Amino acid sequence: MSENLSSFKGFEARKAAWEVIQAVGGGAFADVALERTFNLYSFNSMDKALITELSYGAIRQRYFLDCWIDSLGKVSAKKQPPLLRWLLHLGLYQILKMERIPPSAAINTTVELAKTHHLKKLAPVVNGILRSALRSKEKGLLLSKSNNPSLELAKNESLPFWLADELIAWKGVEAANKIAQAFNSISPIDIRVNKLRANLKEVKEIFDSSGIQNQVIPNCPYGLEVRAGVGEPRKWPGYVEGLWSVQDRSSQLIAPSLGPLPGEKILDACAAPGGKSTH
């Protein structure tokens, strides 16, 4: 069985996601690590979407997943070999956070990655922790609770404890939970139309005709919201031609709010790379 698993659908994508998680664990920026992986290997759009979801999801839920390792393993997460810790994150994220992936696929491919990538002796540990997590999920058993609401929020929503504590002090437990859940939600992609080359209506029509789901962003005269998970933005129509660029809606509001006038000199002291500067 072991020699055939590497040909299973999604195996190479999971391997690539693991590499991204490892890179970020070593200090790399997530988007840079992901881009490097896409440049190294040839993946179709579906595999790229899976890699993105697995890597970003596991990174986003790092503390939550560490808590599960602490709960189920004999060795705490931070004392695990980094390679094993990140692999467990990959498997646990699929089991605990991705309903569309069959648990058997998540467990088998993660164990196979351990066997074939320098963790063969620890493969039984991987198998045991993942199967324990699955049993706990099926029985409705969650992480052990404490009487500290800040700790509970930090564990369940994968936040630094200090941030959970500040949110509760600021907004109360209920509102803090909603804010934390928003932190972990998958955001749509916002784009800003280059008014020197196109207008909002033209770009919207181009996206509509290409099957890219989008909608106008309220109060952003040149902004469109695109549903996440529809492929690489650089391959969307109009990108190469410079009709639009990716820019968050909050950033799109900066230049109009400033109200620059012809002839004025304005210093953007935080430009990197300068999306707002070119607005």
Predicted regions and their residues:
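Class I Rossmann-like S-adenosyl-L-methionine
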Residues: 1-234
